[in-house]
Amino acid sequence: MELISKALEAVRRYPLCDSCLGRLFALMGYGIENRERGQAIKTILHMAAVSDYRKGKDVTADLIALAKCHLPTRRFLAGVGIRVDEERCYICGDLMEGVEKYAEMAVEQLRGLDFVSFAVGSTLPEELLEKEAEVVKSLLVTTGESVKHEVNRRIGKELLRRLSDKRVDKLRPNVVVNVDLVSGQVKVVRNPILIGGRYLKLGRKIAQAKRFGNVRTTLLEKLAYLRDTFGGEDHVIHVSGREDSDARMLGSGRPLVVEVKQPLRYTAQVAPFRDKDVIFLPVGFTDRNEVRRLKEKAKTDIKLYRVLVLSESPLKQDDLSKLSALSGATVTQYTPRRIKRLHPRKKRVRMVYDVAWRLVSPHVFELYIRCQGGLYVKEFVHGDGGRTAPNVAELLNTRLEVLELDVLYIE
């Protein structure tokens, strides 16, 4: 039988523990742990060699090789006057014995965490991995399992036994148990919770994340209740684009993801939030892919703005009719002067799809601008000293000031 001959070749070359021998043939059989498989293989090799020895065949070398990693064979040889010392496993150095002890260490660290799912990761000595690769290559074995996979699987299996109400999730686990077989340490990593939703800003002077100037509060501060709900150490927000702190965000709101870092509770319920300044409507839990999608989507979103504008010169309806020329315009903008200190001089090109207007008084009018995401709307109105072209002020031949800015809708 090829398995037996291959196993005999393995023990002739290397002293292997039950796990490391059994792992070479992990794909042969089902529902058998590598230790059990290795024990069974050694038992068969032992029985065959002892039988041949008693028949007078010269199998002493095979018995000695097997005895280095098999107690019954050592005892048999001792009975016929041949002493063989036990040797460490060539691959793992006997590290595979009792790896389940790390599950016990992990359970202690997991105590007090309210979680549902976990995954196991491991760090193994480089020499161990090199020796495993050497053995597999020299024996031309194609039926094996990697030692790293076995370590993770066995520890995960023991954790499931001890934590019967939890489940393994290799894609999006709440926590990751990292086992370092080099140092003998276990570290539990609490993965962040990502909550998707939409927010509306009903007031002005509200920044997204940082307080500056005359900002009254921030969206980040308003959403701190989510950090507290999940017992997190910190929280950050990932937003699809941004509006100025003095602009309202109306309509159906702007998409965002709230990231709660180092949470203690993964099963809490997410409640919506509302006060006089901000509304947050949670959609559900999400992942990093959604964060990346938000960032990309912000570049192509189409937005509808309402702008209340003050004109230095009096205007008539006929004057505003000139603005129809801006519908379908391609606008070139350099980094606005108001944020130039924060960003290098950079050119961007954005589309203005539609422009509508309403004259409120000779010096005040409303603009409705439907445009590509990323357009600096204030600069599109007043021109920013020629850094944005074309612009509304240039077309009306007057100085303009933005009094109010609202994002009405994001398509």
Swiss-Prot record:
SUPFAM superfamilies referenced in this protein's UniProt entry, alphabetically: Pseudouridine synthase
PROSITE patterns given in the database record: THUMP
Keywords: Isomerase, RNA-binding, tRNA processing
Domain THUMP: 65-192
EC numbers, comma separated: 5.4.99.25
InterPro entries: PsdUridine_synth_cat_dom_sf, Pus10, Pus10-like, Pus10-like_C, Pus10_THUMP_arc, THUMP_dom
Catalytic activity: uridine(54) in tRNA = pseudouridine(54) in tRNA; uridine(55) in tRNA = pseudouridine(55) in tRNA
Catalytic site positions: 244 (nucleophile)
Annotated binding of substrate, by residue: 305, 376
HAMAP family, per the entry: Pus10_arch (MF_01893)
Family affiliation: Belongs to the pseudouridine synthase Pus10 family.
Name of the featured protein: tRNA pseudouridine synthase Pus10
The species this protein was found in: Pyrobaculum arsenaticum (strain DSM 13514 / JCM 11321 / PZ6)
Gene: pus10
